[in-house]
């Protein structure tokens, strides 16, 4: 076999982005055949990537791209092991190519993305090659691919720290109001990025979830009331319910009668009941929908006007525009949400803090 030239090693390095020594070893292994050396390194890279895939990837980025006409958008969460790698130019290029691949192949799931192609090879193979080159486990964890039907727009917001992204799809009736819908969707996406609503509406909750969360909520309020009582401050009302989905017509009718009976017993004139009962019912609903106010986008109070819920803000816009605006889809990604670090990593962090 002829000696492996420096030019050939450099060419292989340029083609594969693998270190010079590994390139030379690969060329020696395959007797200087460039294509076989590329295949050899790919196989070697895949082997390394498989080992790296056992590591926990909880850093990375959330990135999104909204089409200029606001009729489509894609969003992705890509995890790496360290924040340092997430700032690497190679990693940024991977994120860019991932978003483009989702658009080109119209992928709607992670599985569809991995089976699609990029640069004439499977995307999954491309991802493994990047794991080998970058040197960390990299995971495409979530993707979103939204298309706006007629009379809908999509807008979004990605936080500057690249850790949170939100997409909002909004419906309108009059095409002239599309720009206003775009503006409102952007503002609501910014709200959602900050306030972390879990779902769009209380209808997305299961009854079991609401009942469990209500018990937790009551325990919190009772604890707060103990402290308030000690300090001589007003006590909070203890709710019976947690969400609007529990407030059936029967429940509301019963509560209204309770208030009317109280007014009758107090000797209040019947002609003023309606106004008093209306206020009491509004307070009852507010006190018994606290889970909605915490966890639903429509039920949360707007960060730019904390006197109004998001639902009320949308209603006000609709009235102003003489239209009916409605959020039809809400997607929020937060980097590493639900990923737990290994116990030993946490123990090491605690130990370091105690030194």
Swiss-Prot record:
Signal peptide: none annotated. It is found in: Cytoplasm. GO terms for cellular component: cytoplasm. Its main location: cytoplasm. Belongs to the EF-Ts family. Associates with the EF-Tu.GDP complex and induces the exchange of GDP to GTP. It remains bound to the aminoacyl-tRNA.EF-Tu.GTP complex up to the GTP hydrolysis stage on the ribosome. This is Elongation factor Ts. The gene is tsf.
């Amino acid at each position: 076999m002829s000696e492996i030239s420096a030019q050939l090693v450099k060419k292989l390095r340029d083609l594969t982005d693998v270190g010079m020594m590994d390139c030379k070893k690969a060329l020696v292994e395959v007797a200087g055949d460039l294509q076989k050396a590329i295949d050899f390194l790919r196989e070697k890279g895949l082997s390394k990537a498989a080992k790296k895939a056992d590591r926990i990837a909880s850093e990375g980025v959330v990135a999104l791209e909204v089409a200029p006409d606001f009729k489509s958008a894609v969003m992705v969460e890509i995890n790496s092991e360290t924040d340092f790698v997430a700032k690497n130019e190679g990693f940024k290029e991977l994120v860019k190519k991932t978003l483009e691949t989702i658009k080109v192949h119209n992928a709607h799931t992670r599985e569809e993305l991995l089976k699609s192609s990029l640069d004439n090879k499977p995307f999954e193979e491309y991802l493994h090659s990047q794991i080998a080159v970058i040197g960390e486990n990299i995971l495409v964890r979530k993707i979103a691919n939204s298309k706006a039907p007629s009379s809908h727009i999509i807008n979004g917001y990605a936080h500057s720290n690249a850790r949170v992204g939100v997409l909002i799809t909004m419906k309108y009736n009059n095409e002239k109001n599309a720009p206003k819908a775009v503006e409102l969707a952007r503002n609501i996406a910014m709200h959602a990025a900050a306030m972390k609503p879990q779902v769009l509406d209380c209808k997305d909750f299961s009854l079991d979830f609401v009942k469990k969360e209500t018990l937790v909520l009551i325990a919190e309020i009772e604890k707060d009331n103990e402290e308030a009582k000690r300090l001589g401050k007003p006590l909070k009302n203890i709710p019976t319910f947690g969400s609007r989905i529990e407030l059936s017509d029967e429940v509301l009718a019963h509560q209204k009668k309770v208030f009317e009976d109280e007014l009758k017993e107090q000797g209040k004139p019947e002609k003023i009941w309606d106004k008093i009962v209306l206020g009491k019912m509004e307070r009852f609903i507010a006190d018994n929908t606290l889970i909605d106010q915490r966890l639903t986008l429509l039920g949360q109070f707007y960060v730019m006007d904390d006197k109004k819920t998001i639902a009320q803000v949308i209603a006000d816009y609709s009235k102003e525009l003489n239209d009916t605006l409605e959020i039809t889809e809400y997607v929020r990604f937060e980097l590493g949400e639900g990923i737990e670090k290994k116990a030993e990593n946490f123990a090491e962090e605690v130990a370091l803090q105690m030194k």
